[in-house]
Every structure is written in C-alpha cells, then in structure tokens.
Design a protein with these regions (language model features):
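Short amphipathic alpha-helices and their capping/turn segments at secondary-structure boundaries
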Residues: 1-6, 48, 73-84, 124-129
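Substrate-binding cleft of secreted/luminal carbohydrate-active enzymes
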Residues: 3, 85-99, 109-197
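Extracytoplasmic/secreted envelope proteins and their assembly/folding machinery
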Residues: 41-44, 48, 78, 82-85, ...
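Short, hinge-like loop/turn segments at secondary-structure boundaries
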Residues: 24-26, 76-78, 106-108, 192-194
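Active-site-proximal loop/short-helix segments
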Residues: 5-33
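The substrate-binding groove and active-site-proximal loops of carbohydrate-active enzymes
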Residues: 29-39, 105-112, 147-149
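Short acidic, glycine/proline-rich loop/turn micro-motifs
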Residues: 19-21, 100-104
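Aromatic-lined carbohydrate-recognition surfaces of secreted/lumenal glycan-active proteins
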Residues: 7, 14, 35-75, 116, ...
Length: 197
C-alpha cells in the first residue's frame, strides 16, 4: 500500500513581486545566481534524481500560463519543467482566462471545450515538442462553479474539458480540482469521469 509518486504543487516563486524586485527591495537569486526558471529546474532535477533512486515518480503542478512562450514572473517555464519530471500538470481552469484571451468573445468558463482545446493545441503541444524527453501531461480540470449562482459546472462542462484536452492530443489523464474535496460533488461527475474519449 502507499503511493509511488511525489507531486510538487505550486513549484514556483511568489507572484505579484515584480515591483519589489524592480525596486531592488527583494532578491530571489540563490548562491548560484540562477534565474528563477533555472532554480526551479535545478531543484526538480535534484528531487527527481533522488526520488528515482527510490523507485518514485515525480510530478509538478504549474499554472496554465507557463505553457506560453515566455518565462513567467514566478519562474515557471514549461520546457524547463517538462524536461526533468515524469508528469507535468498544468492548471488551465477556464474561469482563470480573461474574456478576450485567445480571441474568445464570451467568458471562457462558458466554453470549456474551446478554451482547453486551444490551450492544449496551441501552447502545451508546442512546448512539449521543444524538448527531447517531455513529461506525461496530466492536466488539472475545473470541477467547481466559476461564479456561484451564475453558471453551474456539471457533467457537460467536465466532459467538454476532458474532450478538449484529448482532441488537442493531451491524453495523459486529468485531475479534477475542487477546493472543498466534496466527495458527493465528485460523484455527480462520475459519468464524465468514466466516459471513453
């Protein structure tokens, strides 16, 4: 019994610190003077090497934004992470995207298939191809209501997210995110979770 995987959640530097860094009120450089993305990659390389000696898989959770072509302000850069861990898990929750992001004119959370498919096809798949040995992509999906009382996330929205990812070529699995971890709510999605995509 037990688990054969260690998942590093929020493997990043603090966000919203740009002004402090710019004004030299905070310095995140380590003793090796590595940039943030380098420091994260070095840590994950070390952790992966050590945990592999014990027969343990290593996964890392990253923001959906990290699949873009730039290094994020908090140091996450998809190619640097996918190159050193066994599993990478982006968090592209549809309610985290702005209304005009990716050219959509209606709120992204109302179009879970389109947003997940676009993100997967146009960003993740391209970043995965930039390295020789990319990790398996197992994406976090949104299992909570984006705006309580306004829009409900049920089986249809869960299915659309999973299908959008699969149609983009991301077939390494998914994990539903619901901060309350309410098992009764998860049961409502069992049809979506058990469907073949």
């Amino acid at each position: 019994m037990g688990f054969n995987e260690i998942q590093f959640d929020y493997v990043r530097f603090p966000d919203r610190t740009y002004t402090l860094e710019y004004n030299k009120k905070i310095d995140f450089k380590n003793t090796y003077s590595e940039e943030k993305a380098q420091a994260i990659q070095t840590f994950l390389m070390y952790a992966t090497d050590e945990l592999h000696k014990l027969g343990v898989y290593v996964s890392a959770d990253v923001f959906g934004e990290s699949a873009h072509t730039y290094v994020t302000a908090y140091g996450q850069y998809w190619p640097a992470i996918t190159n050193v861990v066994d599993v990478i898990s982006g968090m592209p929750y549809p309610d985290h995207f702005s209304n005009n992001e990716y050219g959509f004119t209606t709120p992204p959370y109302k179009q879970p298939y389109k947003i997940m498919n676009y993100w997967g096809e146009n960003y993740v798949m391209k970043r995965q191809q930039e390295v020789d040995t990319p990790a398996v992509v197992r994406t976090w999906i949104q299992a909570y209501n984006p705006i309580p009382g306004d829009f409900y996330y049920g089986n249809k929205q869960i299915e659309e997210q999973i299908k959008g990812l699969n149609d983009a070529g991301l077939t390494g699995g998914f994990m539903p995110w619901l901060s309350s971890s309410n098992l009764d709510r998860y049961k409502l999605f069992k049809d979506a979770f058990s469907k073949e995509y």
